[in-house]
Amino acid sequence: VVKDSRGIEAVKGLDLTVRHGEVVGIAGVDGNGQSELIQALSGLRAIESGSIQLDGKDITKLPTRQRTEGGLGHIPEDRHKHGLVLQMGLDENIGIQTYYKEPLSKNGFLNKKAFVDLAERLIEEFDVRTPSPTVAAGALSGGNQQKAIIAREIDRDPSLLIAAQPTRGLDVGAIEYIHKRLIDQRNKGKAVLLMSFELDEILNVADRIAVMYEGRIVDVLDTKETNETELGLLMAGSTREQARAKEQEAL
């Protein structure tokens, strides 16, 4: 159970498993608990009851850094609020989660060259368009900001990558690139949880789709066995049987 900012239960009695080597998409109309679920999984929101397991370990009460160190990657829904410090350099943003580890830090001192070296490698690998690795993150386009976040998260080789609205507001080229990177993670045997309000994105990227309605997962379907019409009906509160009966009536 997870409450929203008003203290109202936004996630209720939810049970979901994401396996290695698959992308699970969370589909639902905005406001049905998806954002609160992602925040709870990533450590940005407390849960009232229940548990969160990552590779068999209970991470329910762990702070965000320890979840990250335990193998959780997170592409946040709001890249400006939770993904980047816009006034800081791109290199600093890329190293922000591992700044206390070698080679970025040694004996309590930061190694500026190591930050730049890391940023240059990821800029090249993830095609981040920037005039300099030290330019302020806020000076980049939305697509390049998102690529930088994805580069930072994937470079840590997380066991589970949570991607919340990863392509919102981006152009077609950036969208295709990000989809490819998510699928690459799946193909490497990683678990990927994708939350999106765009049904075509869910259908194009996910292997299984969990539909949320009023804070609960009402159904989980194989992507190959469903379609946009059925998902839309489930998102509006219909059962699978009701949705398929309505589809038959429409034929």
Q: Residue spans of the language-model regions?
A:
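Glycine-rich phosphate-binding loops of nucleotide-dependent enzymes
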Residues: V1-L251
